Amino acid sequence: MHKDKPTLNLDALRDSVAFSVRLSQAAIDAIDVGTTLDPAGDAALAAARGYVAGGARNNALRRAAMDAYRAAQRVGAGPAFHALHSVSAAAGAAFLHPPGGSTDAHQTKHILGAAVQYVLCIEASGGDSAAAFGSVMTCIPDAIKELLRMYPEPVAGKQRYGAVLVMLYRSIT
């Protein structure tokens, strides 16, 4: 759970983005073969990968995340919607705030957002959400577990996204 004065470093941010990129790619791979992902999704995934490889946490990365988010909104629903949101979350994971602020519970979305969207993508594809959840659980590096323990449990809210977010958080921490 929330520790006294934990710190957040660049390695933790890069680990979080790398984890998110992995799940975003899995979401993209899960959508129908005939489905073409909006170019904004490809750009956001490339930007996130660039960050993991040592690139800057800058406005271009933030814009790529927002462009993928807007592309998802244009799609509206279905597997491609969730795949685009997963990619947006991967690029946005670089903007995690250090623990200790008033938005701490919200920050878990930066860490687990791509994972949540991966599970929702599998569900929207008619796949087994329990298997998708299991896939997420088997690929979580220790660094992400440690990072999550710095933040309080998120609020589930009324949507499926929030329920999956809380289930993942509880299972990991």
What are the functions of these language-model segments?
Residues 1-137:
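Structured binding/interaction patches within domain cores
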Residues 143-173:
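Acidic, carboxylate-rich catalytic segments that either coordinate divalent cations
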